[in-house]
Amino acid sequence: ENASKDVSYTIFCSGKSYAERSNFYKGALLKYIPLEANGIQSIFYDMLSLIKATRKSDVILILGVSGCVFLPIYRLFSKKKLIINIDGLEHRRDKWGKWTRRFLKFSEKMAIKHSDVVVTDNKGIQDYVTEEYGKESVLIEYGGDHVICDVGEEEKEVLERFCLKKETYSLALCRIEPENNVEMILKAFSESNEILAFIGNWHNSEFGERMQKVYGGSANIRLLAPIYDLKVLNVLRSDCKYYLHGHSAGGTNPSLVEAMYFGKPIFAFDV
């Protein structure tokens, strides 16, 4: 569906992420920033996006807090309404070092202090914001019904493409990072005869490349590249025997919520 005709939307995207750049998506204007949206560059990516958005926007929605360290300065020259979805508790992630965690905690504090509206995606994060900062937030939880679609005759073709049979395999889907317990899952399946289909960005990091090299040759493990086709994901989710969720940090994970909608048994870390 297209964005509302009553509201003009501008979305800022990383110019580093797309070989082909569209100017519009479902009625929204797309603008590109020549920086990565993740890692250290995300701070400057957020700052530049915010400055550009200020010129013609009445309301600005910020997703994540890494660039919010800039907000005290921003508030000196702009009173535009800021809505900030803080996502998860980035400063608690194991992958960050001490100084990065301190920076992210400070940036989170600035986000909540200088925002007009704070959005949280689950009750736990909402309670954290209230207890830590004494500020109320708007709870907007993830839905999962958007993943259901009519696959028609594609079910058989999808399973054959990935050498899978209905309800004989387990499925995992995540960013390939150590804190998602990727290696633990792969090691466990490599020592069994159970079939695993694991969808992720295996070539975006040294860790992912190493996992691909170590476990990619296992006869019972399928390491699949990222899949964005909802029909293909629908088949893989609805036909799996179990769903595995190894995340150990972060906020509500959309892929978990989506998987729950299919009613399959879920093995989740530390739950």
Residue spans for each PLM region:
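Conserved donor-binding/catalytic core segment of Leloir-type glycosyltransferases
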Residues: 159-180, 186-199
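Nucleotide-activated donor-binding/catalytic signature segment of Leloir-type glycosyltransferases, i.e.
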Residues: 200, 209-230
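Aromatic "clamp/platform" in nucleotide-sugar-dependent glycosyltransferases that forms part
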Residues: 248
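Donor nucleotide-sugar binding/catalytic pocket of nucleotide-sugar-dependent glycosyltransferases
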Residues: 81-84, 108-153, 164-167, 172, ...
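An aromatic- and histidine-rich active-site surface loop
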Residues: 41-54, 59-87, 251
